[in-house]
Structure formats: C-alpha cells, structure tokens
Amino acid sequence: MVSSALKLEPKVDVRRANQRKHTDLDWLDSWHSFSFGRHYDPANTHFGLLLVSNDDVVKPGMGFETHPHRDMEIVTWVLEGSLVHEDSKGNTGMIYPGLAQRMSAGTGIQHSEKNDSWRLDDEPHDQDVHFVQMWMPPDSRSIDPSYEQLDINRELGPVDAGSGDLVVVASGMDAHRDRRAIFIQQQHAALYAARLQSGASVELPAAAFVHLFVARGAVDLEGTGPLDTGDAARMTAAGGQRVTAGTKGAEVLVWEMAARLAN
C-alpha cells in the first residue's frame, strides 16, 4: 500500500557504500542498498517507494538466467560495458551507458540479463558490465507487461565531460508528461541522472523523499558533507540542496518520490 498523505520532519540519512549487504559469486559482485534475497533486514526494506537499488558487476559471458517478475517497475542504468536483455514478450535490447531501460512486469514476465553483447553481432570482449538496477511497485497491479529504452547521452553529455544538468531519466509524474524520458507506471516517482565535471553542481528536487546515489566519483552534499562512490543519502522532506562534484567529477542517480510504502 502507498501513502501520499504525509507529515514529515526534514532528515538526511547517509548510508555508506560499505554498509550495504554484499553478494560475491564467481560471476557476480553485487551490493544491495536494501534487503534483497538472503540479505534481509526488517529495518531496511525500502525508502519512499524504492524497494531495490542493486549495484552490480557481471563478468563477460555471464549473467542472470531467465527468471520471472510480477507487478514491479524495474529500471536499469549501465555505468560501464553493455548488458543484453531478452524477455518472454519478445523484447531484446542492448543497454549501455546513457541508455535507460524500463521493464514493467505487470501480470508477469520472464527475462534474462547477460554480459554477452557479441550475440547481437558485436565483437567478443572481456569487459565487465557495471550497472545499477532499481525496483519499485506500480500504481496498479496486473497491468500488461511492457518494455522501453531511451538513449539520453545527448542530454547528459560525455562521461568525462558531463553537461552538468539533472536530466529526467524515467517518470510517471504528470509534471514530466512532455519531457523526453521513459515512462514508469508510478505517478509518485521520477528518476534523474547527472554527469558532473569537477566543481559542477546541481540542485536536488523538492520532495517528500529524495534518494541520492553516487554511482561514480565523489560529491559534496550541501549541509551534509562528502559522499563517495557507492554512498547514498536518504532525504525526507528535502529540496534545494546542491550536490557538487569532486576533483574527478561524478555521476549521480536521484529519485524524487512524493509517497512511500505504508508500513
């Protein structure tokens, strides 16, 4: 159940990269911001509407075999390498840095995700794929499954020379209906990304819940202090703080959420 009628006190909860739970397999190195799989913590099941934020590295030729999902909005953001998606509805796509992907599981879908882009007429490679995958519930259960991807590299700028803009990546909010972004079936949430050169900054949106994840580099969060790669800030009743990149630049992912999952 989702609750949007909220009375909240301003708060910033910093979660360091090394506080996350860790899954280390031969083919997978995964860091979990929230409870996931065998890593269950009843005090850390979600923030706002965000249920999963996994920071994954998958070795070449390996990946997640076909598995099911239902009633979940899943957004994937690649940082390095490429990830191949295939699902039971006939969708196939190669996801790379700056290309956002969304899968709405709805009534049920099965898919695989693998680091084997050479199957799509590419050259074999030995590069890991590094990506962040985020899950949240949809507004309505049992919708038709769907898939969408969108390249927003033009808006973001190059990894090493970012535009410095906070770009809408995925949204179900009415305010973003006319924006170039992938659509998610969740009217209370939007995902932004920014690639920041050294010293560049962006202003965070005002929202009941804001989740800031440092995907690359390091930043300074106004009023809080430094955040390094893999760190996150969970902000309640937030808005207006500036995020400034450190000397090596940064890439950040920001969720704006106007509701939370009811306890």
Language-model segments: residues:
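Jelly-roll (double-stranded beta-helix
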Residues: 1-263
